[in-house]
Amino acid sequence: MRKIFVFMFLLIIPLACIPFSQQESFDDKAGTQVAIALTANALDATVSALENTIEPTVDDQPDIQPTDSPPFDPTQELGDPAYTDDSSSWTSWNVDPGDQILESVTTISVSDGKLSMQSSQVGKFHWWLNYREIDNAYLEAIFETGNCAGNDEYGLVFRSPDYFNGVGYYFTLTCDGKFDLREKTDPNSLIQDNQLRFGMQTSSLINSGPNQKNTLGVWMNGETIRLYINNQFLDEITDAKLKSQGHFGLFIYAKKTPGFKISLDQISYWTINN
């Protein structure tokens, strides 16, 4: 028995001296890669770097679907308007030339061929609607401001189901050159800042200050609403909560200037046929 044990011991010693090949270090082969992901929509395209991700192969990349790009100026594609009000009419607004209609602190009137609203006090929001209703359409209006300052607001109302509860969309400009889209869906709610979809963005396309003219345009088609200023695209939403036809008109919100006045020189709409 002792002899067998010695023999096995002598056999193990040389085997222990035989080198085994070592695995190559994973850390020596691994590297850091950066993948670039591109996202795009009808408004703009942004590029962001995503660190510590594996670069996708061609087979892994999703198919890019074409988008419906906003037209530069919708009126160039839609032809003649279906409806226009200007200095020769204003018969669809329940106000006649020479009238002075007082609603709370706001006076609505027609003079010098323009439909005007003027607020004698600050802090009052007032709208005035056309009796017509439109569905999918492009709506455009030429506004002129009087004396104003800062965050005095004015603009277009659309998709308003009735005259009284204020439900609808409000394409808003301020005297100091900001824009937004107010979405008021609750008839029992007051006008609030949390109804604003864009957070009051500044735009160089807006002619800011008193005694200025701006052309406001709204493309409304189902859940898509696009905003235009002076015939150039501003921004859009694609999840509009109010999608049914409704009245349209103008509004004024004197937040800084007593006596703030706006005038509507012309308003037109074009029907969008899907």
Kindly label every feature range from the protein language model.
Residues 17-84:
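Ser/Thr-rich, Proline-interspersed low-complexity disordered segments
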Residues 81-105:
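Short, tryptophan-glycine- and acidic/Ser/Thr-enriched carbohydrate-recognition patches
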Residues 87, 265-269:
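Extracellular beta-strand elements of beta-rich domains used
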Residues 119-190:
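Secretory/extracellular carbohydrate-interaction modules
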Residues 189-217:
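Short, aromatic/His-centered strand-loop micro-motif at the edge of beta-sheets
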Residues 237-265:
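Flexible glycan-contacting loops in extracellular carbohydrate-active proteins
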